[in-house]
């Protein structure tokens, strides 16, 4: 089994590829297979953003592995104007939907309830098969459950500071 424990910088060449769905790219622990069929064990640092299309991983044996986003069934959303597209994005964000944002369009994982809501808002919705690369959040860091305070964890950039006023 090819063991992978760390991310690395992009390179012009690689030894193997993983083609993974968003769900698989979001996991820090995963058993999967390279596109050539080799068994892989991912043991990545927890709390990091999902792997993105084009990311590189370094295997324990020194091989470089490139990540590809697997095409998934998505809803492609377009609207008549920027206001309607912004309104659609607002309603999807209010439901904490993973969302890919393009120039004049939105994409999300196929969901018939959300598709119906978007159509009621006046959006044009079509189903497409494409790699899904949603935004991973405004804070740029991964999700964490740190109880050790700021010395152990901090968001960058710090947008606000909570605490008792003195």
From Swiss-Prot:
GO cellular component, one term: cytoplasm
Species per Swiss-Prot/TrEMBL record: Azotobacter vinelandii (strain DJ / ATCC BAA-1303)
GO molecular function list: nickel cation binding; unfolded protein binding
Family, similarity comment: Belongs to the UreE family.
Protein's cellular compartments: Cytoplasm
Example GO BP: urea metabolic process
Role, per record: Involved in urease metallocenter assembly. Binds nickel. Probably functions as a nickel donor during metallocenter assembly.
SUPFAM superfamilies for the chain: Urease metallochaperone UreE, C-terminal domain, Urease metallochaperone UreE, N-terminal domain
SMART domains xrefs: UreE_N
Protein name per UniProt: Urease accessory protein UreE
Pfam families: UreE_C, UreE_N
Chain segments annotated as coiled-coil in the UniProt record: none
Keyword set, alphabetical order: Chaperone, Cytoplasm, Nickel
């Amino acid at each position: 089994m090819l063991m992978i424990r760390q991310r690395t910088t992009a390179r012009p060449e690689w030894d193997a590829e993983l083609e993974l769905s968003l769900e698989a790219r979001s996991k820090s622990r995963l058993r999967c297979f390279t596109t050539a069929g080799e068994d892989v064990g991912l043991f990545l640092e927890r709390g990091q953003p999902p792997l993105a299309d084009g990311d590189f991983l370094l295997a324990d044996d020194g091989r470089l592995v490139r990540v590809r986003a697997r095409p998934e069934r998505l809803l492609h959303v377009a609207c008549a104007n920027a206001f309607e597209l912004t309104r659609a994005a607002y309603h999807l964000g209010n439901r904490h939907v993973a969302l890919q944002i393009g120039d004049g369009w939105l994409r999300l994982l196929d969901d018939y309830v959300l598709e119906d809501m978007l159509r009621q808002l006046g959006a044009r919705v079509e189903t497409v098969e494409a790699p899904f690369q949603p935004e991973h959040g405004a804070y740029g860091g991964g999700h964490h459950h740190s109880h050790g305070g700021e010395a152990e964890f901090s968001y960058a950039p710090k947008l606000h500071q909570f605490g008792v006023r003195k």
